[in-house]
From Swiss-Prot:
Tissue: Expressed in brain (at protein level).
Function: ARL8 effector that promotes the coupling of endolysosomes to dynein-dynactin for retrograde transport along microtubules. Acts by binding both GTP-bound ARL8 and dynein-dynactin. In nonneuronal cells, promotes concentration of endolysosomes in the juxtanuclear area. In hippocampal neurons, drives retrograde transport of endolysosomes from the axon to the soma. Plays a role in the generation of neuronal polarity formation and axon growth. Implicated in the formation of a single axon by developing neurons.
Gene3D superfamilies: 1.20.5.170, 1.20.58.900
Localization, UniProt: Cytoplasm; Endomembrane system; Cell projection, Invadopodium; Cell projection, Growth cone
Official protein name in the record: Protein RUFY3
UniProt lineage: Eukaryota, Metazoa, Chordata, Craniata, Vertebrata
GO BP terms: actin filament organization; cell differentiation; negative regulation of axonogenesis; nervous system development; positive regulation of axon extension; positive regulation of axonogenesis; positive regulation of cell migration; positive regulation of intracellular protein transport
Amino acid sequence: MSALTPPTDMPTPTTDKITQAAMETIYLCKFRVSMDGEWLCLRELDDISLTPDPEPTHEDPNYLMANERMNLMNMAKLSIKGLIESALNLGRTLDSDYAPLQQFFVVMEHCLKHGLKAKKTFLGQNKSFWGPLELVEKLVPEAAEITASVKDLPGLKTPVGRGRAWLRLALMQKKLSEYMKALINKKELLSEFYEANALMMEEEGAIIAGLLVGLNVIDANFCMKGEDLDSQVGVIDFSMYLKDGNSSKGSEGDGQITAILDQKNYVEELNRHLNATVNNLQAKVDALEKSNTKLTEELAVANNRIITLQEEMERVKEESSYLLESNRKGPKQDRTAEGQALSEARKHLKEETQLRLDVEKELELQISMRQEMELAMKMLEKDVCEKQDALVSLRQQLDDLRALKHELAFKLQSSDLGVKQKSELNSRLEEKTNQMAATIKQLEQSEKDLVKQAKTLNSAANKLIPKHH
């Protein structure tokens, strides 16, 4: 990393402001973040220092902000892409402990904080991205629900914590992209909270909002009642996106065991959901059976009442015919009273007939609903049986892999013991070889000495032989 340039002797307000901005974002403006395939590249910028030159140009602050926007956009691309791929490979609902999801929220928090204006309060200056997020409910009415939920959470005490909770609820609602697009399109409202060259005010913000659409395929579930969102430190972990050339792949057996464990957990979770659904459907079937029995009883009572009314109607008809004949000779007022009584009886009969039709229609509806529930129960039972068979098969595979792992470990221990024994034997053989080599050298030296002695004796003998002659 290049050395930091020393500060100038006479700082100005402009240089102090630029220095403060560079100090806050040293991890962004000191490097250029770019993408190489699926990996993150950090390239050092030798021409950027914490303190600008004594005579800075007007383009330096804009250059720093543009570099920060580009870095944040590339980080957002990598974070979103990695989150989608890992979530699809995982194949289950994500929670707050999932590391790629945590890093995504950290990157989004940095994007929302970029170029944020400081609000002056009696405690000092405060930068919070909760203010812009509160505007979303005015632009998209659906966001009012999560805003109210965030405000009602008892554990949140700071605007930063509320903003983090809002991001999590929007992701759970699968509306984060829609909310961000609506917010970015209203730059006249954002100008109250952001500088003119902030990420949310430039093209990079719109690009990030478009990338967020891909997160709609992810299912996430957060429990924020016990989570401390106020005091979390939002630091981007670059190690998740940097390629390690010396990294070695795990053993194939461990990878298979991990995959089978994930499948087993998924099947068990699915089995629990299916069992809960079956229990709910069974409760509904019991309730429908009780309702059906009650409706059958009411229908029987209504049929008996209809029969009684029909008999009464026949009797009333006979009486009315008799009264008509008798009243032809009677006063006109009596005939009018009898006509009114007959009209009331007909009206009452019509109401009872309509009631019977309504009861029969309700009974048919309940019967059809019961048949549908029975069919759904059969299908769910079949699905549960299939999932249980798959679970048994996965458990068997897991047991086989564990046995294979133990066998390989035992063989490895045995081979290590054999290697150790062979090493000891080899050491002994080398020691004996060294001893034999030393003995051979001694024997050779002795042989040389004997040869010398033989030569000496021979020469002495040759000298003695002439003397005797």
